[in-house]
Amino acid sequence: MRIFYSVDVHGAETVWRKWISAIAMYECDCLMLCGDLAGKALVPLIDFGKGYYKSGYYGREVKLKTEEEMLDWEQKLANGGVYSCRINKKELEDLQKHPEKVDEIMKQEVVKRMNKWLDLLCEKIDTSKILSIVMPGNDDPIELDTAIKGHADRGIVYPTDKVVDLGGHELISLEYVTPTPWDTPRETSEEGIKKMLEEKVSWLKNVPNSIWNIHCPPRDTDIDLAPQLSKELKVQAGAEGVKMVHVGSQGVRDMIEKYQPLMGLHGHIHESSGFTFIGKTLCVNPGSEYGEGQLRGFVIELNPTEIVRYWKVQG
């Protein structure tokens, strides 16, 4: 079996389309997109009643006079992982008074895009022949899970609640991470991580031959390094450049050391693309450059008893 494994797309439509295209490019039997599927920003297109809409993102302000211009702007935002909505001045004032309504619109757009993406995946890929695994991550609202599970009858696999057969290997999956500065929807303590993993390990029949799809990477490795942040959540830099610190999970590491599965598939830390070994266990993190439209991934070849080869790709 040949797997294409990628993570942390964060709503970027360009990256999603590239992920689907990878099946032909790398002649894979399995597609895995695991962790942090949703974007992080919502940009309004505002009708002030003057014959045009105004919008802006990252310091750029635009006036949109035609439907074609609005669709083009919305697509540019989507390609970069940003959601959009069309509102008038009165609706803008209401949203400013009621921030919780912005959250609701955001969740609606997240689910809408996820459904669109999964529909596209099912159109482009024969899911009866290509194993297609899609897993949320810590940044993703719970509502997103419904969209993935809603495509089960079309062959999309939601993996966190079951053991998945991966070319003769048992796959278990965990989307939770240890606490972050941003208080994301799926966080738990180190003990919580270990408890969740212990339960999933109990489902396995052959632990040494299993593969663990855990969004959070193991601590103190080459795949858990992120920029050090100040109390104001600003990146810390010195004379030698950005300071990097280990931010992975000790609980994940402890469990890998204890059980020594065949392989760990990880993500979460965008800057730490690479691989490492914990004992006999190979652990990989493709990293992410979704904002630049870059697809990062690992191609992994398996036979029923071992990893044949693996390599990192980007494009």
Segments and roles (model prediction):
Residues M1-H10, G168-T180, I211-H215, L282-S288, ...:
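Active-site-proximal beta-strand elements of phosphoester/diester hydrolases
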Residues H10-T14, A38-L42, V134-D145, V164, ...:
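Active-site environment of divalent metal-dependent phosphoester hydrolases
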Residues G11, K162-G167, T184, T188, ...:
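Binuclear metal-dependent phosphoesterase catalytic core
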Residues E13-K18, Y26, P44, E199, ...:
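Catalytic phosphate/metal-binding cores of nucleic-acid and nucleotide-processing enzymes, i.e., regions
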Residues V15-L166:
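Core catalytic region of metal-dependent phosphoesterases/phosphodiesterases
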Residues P99-V111, I211-Q260:
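Active-site-proximal segments of metal-dependent phosphoesterases and phosphodiesterases across multiple
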Residues L131-I133, V157, E170, N209-I211, ...:
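Proline-centered loop/turn at the N-terminus of a beta-strand
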Residues H169-S210, V245-H246, Q250:
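Binuclear metal-dependent hydrolase catalytic cores centered on His/Asp/Glu-rich metal-binding motifs
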